[in-house]
Amino acid sequence: MKTVSASAPGKFVVLGEHAVVFGKPAVALAIDRRFRCNVSESDVFIVNGEEDDIDKHPHVKHILDIHGIDAINLSSESNLPSGAGLGSSAALCASLSCAVRHMLGKSLDSEEIMREAYAAEYYAQGIGSPMDVSASVHGGGIGLNLPDADELLWTVENRGQKWDVCDIHAPEMTFVIGYTGKRALTGPLVEKVRRYRDRNRFAKDIVDEIGTVTLEGIGALNTGNKTELGKLMTENHKLLSILGVSCPELNRLVDAANEYSYGAKLTGAGEAAV
């Protein structure tokens, strides 16, 4: 029986997480850690050699539902920590969509894989933008809702929000990612910010300000101005902290990093990586 393998990278967010859910701009870069999966046809659902209940794996279930499949034999490995803000679930969805499509002899078109992966992410989390899956499928750097973007990859619309996703060419820079060891669930944190923004004008202003900071940061990133970009990343972290998605451990990491860097911020939904 033929086994098909695929892998996809994780990501980190340079600027704009949470605000991007509401259509504000954001920038993310793929990283050199990946989720890898192997799939083959099966009459029962098997994960890493053990028969399992597919309802416990909503991301996987939704991708299989898209293709009208009840079960597969799935094995996986990853050096992306789960719940660390590095897009592990997006990498899972992207790699699984690619592998299943290849197994079925379907097109490996990047946009089709991205749309399947985003549908699975949204199904599992109930909220969110296509930022993570776009970075995972496309690789390199991606921007969302950037003005005057030249290299449009795809446009995604969902529940009144629209995201134009483009390729960006980031100059050579070094980013260091730290991890608190805490696991944070994306869905509840994004929903927490949504409720806060819907009920509080101040929170809406903070989300708008994150969008402004991100636009300023795009200019700094494009010109390779590390000093300005670092300052704006730190400002972005302060705004995210006001929204309530940071934690003492993250704040200590940011404070420590700021002494020896151009700037620092949390990445992803919060409460995990910086």
Predicted regions and their residues:
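C-terminal nucleotide
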Residues: 2-9, 13, 20-21, 28, ...
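Glycine/serine-rich anion-binding loops at beta->alpha junctions
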Residues: 7, 78-100, 129, 262-274
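Short, solvent-exposed polar/charged micro-motifs at secondary-structure junctions
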Residues: 15-17, 82-86, 155
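Short strand-loop junctions, especially beta-strand C-caps/beta-turns
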Residues: 17, 50, 77-81
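Glycine- and acidic-rich phosphate- and metal-coordinating loops
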Residues: 67-84, 112-119
